[in-house]
Amino acid sequence: MNVILPEVGKPPFATFYLLHGLSDDHTRWLRQTSIERYVEGLPLIVVMPDGGRGFYTTHHQGHDYARYIAHDCVQFVERNFPARPRRQSRCIGGLSMGGYGALRVALGYPDLFVSANSHSGALMIGSRKRQKDRPLSEWEFNAIFGRNPAGTDHDLLHLATNALTAGRLPKIRIDCGVDDFLLESSRTFTRRLDELGVPHEYEEYPGEHNWAYWDEHIRDALTFHAKHMRLKAD
């Protein structure tokens, strides 16, 4: 886990949990983007945990990465850093696998996070149609999600509907590059959100599935989260 602590403001601070992608680890956001510079002036802790290749969900066979983020990481951070322990002061985001993971955790634990964002997310896990560009082998996919994740807690549409019905839906922001191989996944997912009446923001920008895109658009995510957590730059 890497943590950026604010140099401005008075504690306790809001917290942004920032999740990496499938082939990455907890160091990549710091090594590949200017996230530390972008949060200068914000009273915001940034927490970058390691999720392995686990998709931040509760595995069909084995590990519970969703609980690890929502309980273990949140409790560790709030016991050891000056983090404000309330929903209004927690947000979560990520890229690719982490984009799915951010929505999976926020929608699965809607009492914990006020907002969630996904960059270039692999969002249609619940689809029965196998994606030709899915970055997992069939064995690995089934070990994590099972053979038919539709309608389960791996299915973001299922979780979003439940959170909406309960009146605890986090604010949602999704973006994707127009040359990203996951663009159709983002378009299909947001179209289904519209059909289900789930409020969200969706943007498409020039760009591919790479760090140049994520470095640019993490700033949009910070603006989004700061608005919903009512943060003001110093």
Report residues per predicted region.
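Non-catalytic cap/lid and distal C-terminal segments of serine-dependent acyl enzymes
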Residues: M1-D234
